[in-house]
């Protein structure tokens, strides 16, 4: 059964301006350790690809926080939620710490879809209760 649905759209131009002002500190606030590795790799190759990656992760975390109904409040935090790609390329939500414990205790499962174009990144998250 559906527990919650969340969606978010991020203006990559605004994110680029924030990154220009705050630099790496902004990425370190939003991204978890594995996401930071991917971000740095993509940014070094093509800056636009790195910023698009950061925008899709920002958007997906916002959408996830809406789907679980907490917004960006405890137990949700930027770094406790990572959006990582499976070998197939499918994005997956991986949770850590108190957020992971809370999510598991609720018996929830999440699905995420991300997309980006030149100026925008968007995400859609569906959280469902696991059948018992």
Swiss-Prot record:
Its EC number is 2.7.8.7. It catalyses: apo-[ACP] + CoA = holo-[ACP] + adenosine 3',5'-bisphosphate + H(+). Its cofactor is Mg(2+). InterPro entries: 4-PPantetheinyl_Trfase_dom, 4-PPantetheinyl_Trfase_dom_sf, ACPS, Ppantetheine-prot_Trfase_dom. It is found in: Cytoplasm. GO terms for molecular function: holo-[acyl-carrier-protein] synthase activity; magnesium ion binding. GO terms for cellular component: cytoplasm. Transfers the 4'-phosphopantetheine moiety from coenzyme A to a Ser of acyl-carrier-protein. This is Holo-[acyl-carrier-protein] synthase. The gene is acpS.
């Amino acid at each position: 059964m559906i527990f919650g649905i969340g969606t978010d759209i991020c203006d990559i131009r605004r994110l680029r301006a924030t990154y220009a002002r705050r630099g790496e500190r902004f990425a370190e606030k939003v991204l978890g350790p594995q996401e930071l590795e991917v971000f740095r790799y993509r940014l070094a190759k093509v800056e636009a690809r790195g910023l698009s990656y950061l925008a899709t992760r920002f958007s997906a975390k916002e959408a996830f926080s809406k789907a679980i109904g907490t917004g960006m409040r405890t137990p949700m935090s930027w770094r406790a939620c990572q959006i990582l790609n499976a070998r197939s390329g499918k994005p997956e939500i991986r949770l850590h710490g108190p957020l992971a414990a809370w999510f598991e205790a609720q018996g929830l499962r999440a699905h995420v879809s991300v997309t980006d174009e030149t100026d925008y990144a968007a995400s859609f998250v569906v959280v469902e209760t696991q059948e018992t």
